[in-house]
Structure formats: C-alpha cells, structure tokens
Amino acid sequence: MHARLCSLAAAVALAAGAAPSLAQLRVGEWNVTNYGGAGARDAAFRTALYASFNGRQFAPDVLVGQEFLSQAGVTAFLANLNSAAGSPGDWAAGPFNNGADTDNAFFFRTSRVQFLGMTIVSVGSGSPNHPRDINRYDFRPVGYSGAAATIAAYSSHMKAGNTADDQARRLLEAQIIRANAASLPSGWNFLLAADLNIPSSAQSAYVELVGPQANNAGRFFDPILTPGSWNNSNAFRFVHTQDPAVTMDDRFDQILLSASLLDGLAFDYIGSLSIPYSTTTWNDPNHSYRAWGNDGSSFNNLLTVANNQMVGPTIAQALIDAANGLGHLPVFLDLRVPAQVASPTLIDFGTVSQNATAQATLTVTNAGNTTLWTVAGIANLRYTLAASAGFTAPGGTFTEAPGGGSNAHTISMSTASIGPKSGTITINSDSPDEPVRVVMVVGNVVAAACYANCDGSTTIPILNVNDFSCFLNLFASGDPRANCDGSTEIPVLNINDFGCFLNAYSVGCP
C-alpha cells in the first residue's frame, strides 16, 4: 500500500465527522438480524438510515446486507430505503437468492450506481463447509464504463463461535473469497462487506484475507489499519459493532478493500493509509470509515443513547431497536470516484514556413461529473504526454483537479523539411474509461517566401526583369511591401530599399 494523505477538501469533509454522502460514493455494510419483512423495526431502520444529527447521517449509496430471510424481506427493506424521510427515493435491489440459511442482499442508488450483476460465489451448507452463501455484487458509478471503475463487492456472513470447527469453516470461506477475488477481470477493484464473526486479526480466516501470499491478486486490506484482539478490549471501543442492544465489545462487521482502492489513483478510499483509526475519538479526521452510532462511550454496555456524540439520542435508539435484541451496527466508508480525461481530438498547425517556429496548445481537462459527485468526490487526473516523431510534448507527470479548469501544454512541430506533417500526442492517464487517449496532430510546411521574387512567378528563371518592374511599381505607389530593409525612419521608403532589393536579387531564391 502507498501512504497518502487526504486532499484538503476531503480533510475538511472528514473533520466534519461522517457528513452525508453528498459528493463521494458511500458504501455501507449492515447485518440486519433476521429481517423477514415489514414489521415493528421498520421505523427504526428508516431513522437509522436517513435521520440527521449535527449534519451527519448514514445515507449510503450502496448497502451490502446480511441476515435477510426472504425476497419479501428484501422488498420490504427496499421500501424502507425509498420511503425514509430524507431519502432521494432512487433505491433498487440486486437479485436475491434464497440459500440454506439467512441470506445476503444488495441495495444501490440508481442515480449514482450502475448494477452489473450478482454471482453466487459459493453455496453454504453444513460442516465442514461454510454455513451461508457467499455472494458477489458487481457495480460501477454512473458515468463510467472501464474496468478500473468497476467494483466487485463480496457479502459474507461467516460462522460464529470459536471452536476448532467454527474457525476451520471461517478459514474455508476466507479462502474461497480470496481465490474468487484473485480471478476477477484485470483492472477490477473489490471489497468485502461482511459480518466476519472474527474476534481477532490473528485468527486464520482474517490472516487468509489480509495476509501476504505468493499470489496477492486477491488480497484485502483493512483501510483503518486496526489489527488486534478486538473482542472485549477497551482499546478498540471506537470500532466495535456488536452488540448495540446488549454489550458493545466486538468488531465483527467490517469493510475490507483491495489494494487498488488504496493506491491514491483513480477509485480511492477517502482517508489516510498511514495512520490507524484513532483510539481517543470517534470523530477521526483521518478516516471516512465509521461504525455508525458508536461514539466510543458504550464499551461493554448497550449503545449509549443520551448524549451520544456521533448520532444523538434519536438515531442511537433507532439503532438499538433495529438490532432486534441481538444485532449489529452498520459500518460505512467513502470512496472518491475516478477522474475522466478530456482534450481536443485534433490539433492543426496550419501552413508554416520552413524552419519557422511551429507551436500549438493542447488543453487537458479532468471531466469528472462535478454536478453528480462535486469537486471533493472526484479524484485528480494524473497523466503523461508522449509525442510521435516530428512533434514534441512536455515531459513529466501532470495533475489536473476536477472542476472546470484545464492544463495547457505547448506542442511543437518540426519544420526542418517541406511537406504535409501528421502524428499523434498520446495522453496516458489514470482515467479508467480512457487510459490511453490519442490526439491527432497535422500541419503543412512550405518553402519560405523569396523577397526578390516580387511578382511571385514560378516559371524559370524565377527572377527576371519583371521582378524589377514589380518592385518599382510597389515603391512608386508607396506600398509597404517595398520597405525591403524594414526601416521605420521617415521617409520609410528610400534609396536603401533599392539597395536591399538588389542584394536580395543577387543572392537569388532557393
């Protein structure tokens, strides 16, 4: 992983503490505890999802869920997402498959996310297999089509318990998920949003997910750099997610990311990759990752309601009520969407005299959709320029922020030889939809004009008595073209211009 500090705009947003997802792409994870359909908990879910406290709200763009009991449960939860006060009402659900136990679900905002499809990665069953199905949901942000703008989101609800059999079944599930991630199409990003039921980062299943191996293509990373023995440890009280209705003492619910979402290029986690999550405050300005509702004051108790500093009493109580007596807090993180490159497709130098300077300007723009994502929600464009033979472009790596500006680059064309010229300027960038953008460059180089050939004739001999007559006529009429020596003295035309013309005539034309 490459260490990278947040941009100033993102840092300001983070300092506000889990602000609504008005710009970035917010991904949420929530085990909804045996949800089978419309019922007494629905009002609590709606409040937890869209109520606001001090400008903060959950308001995800993508929600990965576990412990759905049926298609009716998915349909009812979708209705909660669309009917909650403050909801944009643009939610849809991915396909539901009814496995052997409780099941996964995937919800997304259609104005911001393109859903590509669902894959049943592995079917759950009894021991020694993992107990529940593993699902993968593939999507992209609206306005993108490239592989590097695609995310495969895995949903998993691993085996609970700490017997040898429990741990072996979790390890098997981790192995299956990592192997599937390693087989994804080239350039894809991936994440795991799951109820891991893992009490410590030292357990084999977690090591399998995040540890280095000979093949690291399917490796996951904890974006908040918080390994440890999470269970019943006060040191991790700000990241505990279970159980808001009983005792907050486990970090079972997590979102893990691929290296490609943590490299500072294109699709990217909004947060610092060099600083672990705070152990002294829930409102960590270095991370967008949050355990929604956990202000760190609930260790070994049910979730704090009165004076809850993160979400206030109304949302805190809703999170408890949604847990159904034994449940989980949602977690979320924010992603910055990739840049999009734009430039002219053609640069025409026109007609240029031989050996004259020929320059033109190439403008490169970050065309990310700021109306949809805002400036803070789009990554900077990073690119280099490469010119074909006969043309030159500036070297080095360039950066262009979103928001309507552009970088201007001087492109030069060689004029050493006569004739039509053509070539390309290649923009190599981290724009996922067009990583290689080719700009055509054309021009025409002609012989320099010969001053002594006053009448512009092309017959042989080019210079003859007609050129003397032409020059005399220009001089007599006061035409500025007779100012052969380029003088500015008064009179501008004088005997020196005759001498200048005779010298040019004696030199001849090439």
Which stretches of residues belong to each language-model region?
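Bacterial N-terminal signal peptides that target proteins for export
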Residues: 1-9
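Cleavable N-terminal signal peptides
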Residues: 9-11, 21
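Divalent cation-coordinating acidic motifs and surrounding scaffolds
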Residues: 23-339, 439-441, 446
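Acidic glycine-/aspartate-rich tracts in secreted/extracellular proteins
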Residues: 33, 69-70, 82-83, 112-113, ...
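Hydrophobic alpha-helical membrane-insertion segments
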Residues: 40, 166, 204, 337, ...
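Feature for long, exposed domains in two main contexts
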Residues: 337-448
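Cellulosome-associated attachment modules in secreted, modular CAZymes
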Residues: 444-510
